[in-house]
Amino acid sequence: MYMKNIFRIILLLTTMLFVSCGDDDEVKLPDTKDVNYANIAGSWRLSEWNGKNLEGDTRYYYITFDRKEKDGKRSYTIYTNLNSATSEQIPGSFLLSKEDDYGDIISGTYYYQLDTDDEWEYSYIVSGLTDTSMIWTAKEDMGEMKVYTRCNEVPADIIAGTRASF
């Protein structure tokens, strides 16, 4: 009888141990979306660049993607003051592709001629695409990383070019 009670207590404690070991402590990552023209369409704000949070910074960088193809290309417009004291509006076209070694890639072309050429400096690996954010990592320089946060629209004063940079 004494052995039966000890056995029952051990069985009860073992059961309690397994019941208390749930998955509650696991970090649940948000569901990621497929990287396609429909899922990245819309307006995005650069919120982090190479580990530096840009929240509250007077500098800004917005990019709006149009998923509809026109003349064989899909367009984007950048609104930024990162390289200038005034607001710049930079149009261009972009392309999504998939590479065996890197996965989903976004690359682009500016619609005006730069000093070197009119292609983006880097092609970017797109990862972690959710309803609210996505991460770009430069394929040619893995230390170059950008985090974009989805926004409803680019602020009107930025589109108009009237936002002060200080």
Model-assigned labels for residue ranges:
Residues 128-134:
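Ser/Thr- and Asn-enriched, surface-exposed coil loops between beta-strands
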Residues 102-126:
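An anionic, turn-rich surface loop/hairpin at beta-sheet edges
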Residues 55-106:
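N-terminal glycine/threonine-rich, aromatic-flanked beta-hairpin/loop signature
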Residues 4-12:
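Sec-dependent signal peptide recognition
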Residues 17-20:
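C-terminal motif of bacterial Sec signal peptides marking the signal peptidase cleavage site
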Residues 46, 96, 124-128:
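A structural signal for short, hydrophobic beta-strand segments that form beta-sheets
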Residues 23, 29, 89-96, 100, ...:
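Edge beta-strand at a domain terminus
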Residues 28-45, 166:
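N-terminal helix-cap/turn-to-beta initiation motif at the start of protein domains
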